[in-house]
UniProtKB/Swiss-Prot annotation:
Belongs to the ABC transporter superfamily. Phosphate importer (TC 3.A.1.7) family. One of its GO terms (cellular component) is plasma membrane. This is Phosphate import ATP-binding protein PstB 2. Part of the ABC transporter complex PstSACB involved in phosphate import. Responsible for energy coupling to the transport system. GO terms for molecular function: ATP binding; ATP hydrolysis activity; ATPase-coupled phosphate ion transmembrane transporter activity. It catalyses: phosphate(out) + ATP + H2O = ADP + 2 phosphate(in) + H(+). SMART domains: AAA.
């Protein structure tokens, strides 16, 4: 089934052998009695970008929050099934939450810098997990800011408040804060939805660079963005996984009509 809509130019399908970093098997999620995610099985290849797409309320962000168990901060929410990280089930009650937070970082839709200096925004998480010298901390802070393509813009005002940065800079600061802990997986929940086009382009370029070191899962409503930056795409609808595969295949020759209808704008 070839689409007539040629507006998208997806990244070419990944041809190299892949290793799954995270894998979901038979995952269900409940908000109280409401069944929000239904029997989802899919995997996220190591050091690739996987995009979650679908209409509002389809379960994309909920699925993302299962991957680091952040839902446990709220009452009456529960997940069943298996979510493995390097073969270990992170839904196991005995799995260390501190270890999970260090291994799986997250950046939210709206930039949320801490009300402290730029330097301390980066150092905060490191101090919580590690004991290192001031000199080592200085290096880690610089490395994180460079990783987020922010160092040159803030190196002379590290003691200034992170809240004083522009929206795009704040989002890159949040990305720097996440990567400072050297996680293995980075979760991005619509990280550019509140940004202007120039800031969005910077974040997209950043994602392309970061995947050399991290496995990235991104939620986006922007079809062009998904086609530009992801290696794999999962289409969700009403809490179910409809289709998942290499981005080029999903956008150029989807196997399910509902997927085609969504990415060509027939509903959304």
């Amino acid at each position: 089934m070839m689409l007539e809509n040629k507006a998208f130019e997806p990244r070419p399908a990944h041809s190299a052998p892949t290793v799954d970093k995270m894998a979901l098997t038979g995952v269900n999620f409940y908000y109280g009695d409401a069944h929000a995610i239904r029997d989802v099985t899919l995997s996220f290849p190591e050091r690739q970008v996987s995009a979650l797409i679908g209409p509002s309320g389809c379960g994309k962000s909920t699925l993302l929050r299962i991957l680091n168990r952040i839902y446990m901060l709220y009452p009456k929410m529960r997940a069943t099934g298996s979510v493995t990280l390097d073969g270990q089930n992170i839904l196991d009650p005995g799995y260390s939450m501190n270890e999970l937070r260090a291994r799986v970082g997250m950046v939210f839709q709206k930039p949320v810098p801490f009300p402290m200096s730029i330097y301390d925004n980066i150092a905060y998480g490191i101090r919580h997990h590690e004991r290192i010298s001031k000199a080592e901390m200085d290096v880690r802070v610089e490395q994180a800011l460079r990783s987020a393509a922010l160092w040159d813009e803030v190196k002379d005002k590290l003691k200034g408040s992170g809240l004083g940065l522009s929206g795009g800079q704040q989002q890159r600061l949040c990305i720097a804060r996440a990567v400072a802990l050297r996680p293995e997986v980075l979760l991005l929940d619509e990280p550019t939805s509140a940004l202007d086009p120039i800031s969005t382009a910077k974040v997209e370029e950043l994602v392309a660079r970061l995947k050399t070191d991290f496995t990235i899962v991104i939620v986006t409503h922007n079809m062009q963005q998904a086609s530009r930056i992801s290696d794999n795409t999962a289409f969700m609808y009403l809490g179910e996984l409809v289709e998942y595969g290499p981005t080029a295949e999903i956008f150029q020759s989807p196997k399910v009509k509902r997927t085609e209808d969504y990415i060509t704008g027939r509903y959304g």
